[in-house]
Amino acid sequence: MSEIKLIVGLANPGAEYAQTRHNAGAWYVQELARICGVTLVPDSKYFGLTARAVLQGKDVRLLIPTTYMNLSGKAVGALANFFRITPEEILVAHDELDMPPGVAKFKLGGGHGGHNGLKDIIAKLANDKNFYRLRIGIGHPGDKNQVSGYVLGKAPAKEQELIEAAIDEAVRSTEILYKENMVKAMTRLHSFKAE
């Protein structure tokens, strides 16, 4: 397995979106930055907030695109190209409708599942889908016509607690990823479910 050199948290920019379910990926990167003691700062060259962090002695770039979600690939592509980071060395954290709040899972490759952020990243990586994802469960509204309003809405307090618990566990599992390997990180994270 390639070493992860870039961790991306997907989000929409602006205060009005900061607490919406669609920004769960960014919450994870913000928490990673906090435990690494680094500050995410705006960098127009990479169309996002970036930081250089050290996890278990290894250098990693953190990125939260400040483009809108459907243009996330612009930021990921710019940073990956500049630092010559391959898709296999990228981990993208995003909200996942098909998993309940309180659950998060790592995954390598796959489609975009209708997620506009993933869709644009795949396009900007020359259709290479072979990057890692951290899927953060937010649940599903039950009707596909309600998805847009749902992901752009705030989770009720109990659901928010579950999402945050899964993110905390994902951060701990990310430390295991750097200390040991992805298999051990997956084993830990995939057995977790916040209640």
Swiss-Prot record:
Q: Cite the binding residues for tRNA.
A: Y17, Y68, N70, N116
Where does it localize?
Cytoplasm
Q: Which InterPro entries match?
A: Pept_tRNA_hydro, Pept_tRNA_hydro_CS, Pept_tRNA_hydro_sf
Q: Which residues cross the membrane?
A: none
EC number(s) reported in the record: 3.1.1.29
Site residues, Stabilizes the basic form of H active site to accept a proton:
D95
Q: Which GO terms describe its biological process?
A: protein quality control for misfolded or incompletely synthesized proteins; rescue of stalled ribosome
The reply on keyword Amino-acid biosynthesis is no
Q: How does it assemble?
A: Monomer.
State what protein this is by name: Peptidyl-tRNA hydrolase
Traced from the root, the source organism's taxonomic lineage reads: Bacteria, Pseudomonadati, Pseudomonadota, Gammaproteobacteria, Alteromonadales
Q: Which gene produces this protein?
A: pth
